[in-house]
Curated annotation (Swiss-Prot):
The keyword Metal-binding applies. Binds to caspase-9. One of its GO terms (biological process) is negative regulation of apoptotic process. This is Baculoviral IAP repeat-containing protein 8. The gene is BIRC8.
Amino acid sequence: MTGYEARLITFGTWMYFVNKEQLARAGFYAIGQEDKVQCFHCGGGLANWKPKEDPWEQHAKWYPGCKYLLEEKGHEYINNIHLTRSLEGALVQTTKKTPSLTKRINDTIFPNPMLQEAIRMGFDFKDVKKIMEERIQTSGSNYKTLEVLVADLVSAQKDTTENESNQTSLQREISPEEPLRRLQDEKLCKICMDRHIAVVFIPCGHLVTCKQCAEAVDRCPMCSAVIDFKQRVFMS
């Protein structure tokens, strides 16, 4: 499906809102299920097309890390799409940030190649943007290394999961030793139950194994998802 003509053929008697030639040029091909399409390069899927929607814009909106998209449209195009969405969202939300501060933060975030790299690794755009904004507001500068960014993203995801779990656990009594035991168990590798967890699996985001055990698996032991990338993290 790397060729335009090959993708175009898949649309056959396409009768939906969006022009099939535009879809094919944007890297998409029809998968034979209603108006569902998929990018030949990044594998990203889209459906439920609305009138006048632009395939390139939707590609950039949902899959900004796609290398085909980057080669064809460039970083500036992708950044402008997300900047426009951010500014539109700011118009309908009450916020304490001034317009000049919002622009300064966005000007710092969007050109940063680590934004695209984190998205390519499977992290959600909104999560990456949010944590970068918080970093700039607290320290005055963006992340310097991808490793620190990934570690903070994983930590934020872990905190969210723990907060949801804590709401349930507060409904039942636990012994004084239980929190300490649980904390110790959470830090142990779920395979060897001996060493501390030290690797996050991408794209599922699970942090469940030590470095040694991570090297021996191709699928996440927690959810069985295929592992595309293994990121070393350092737990405090």
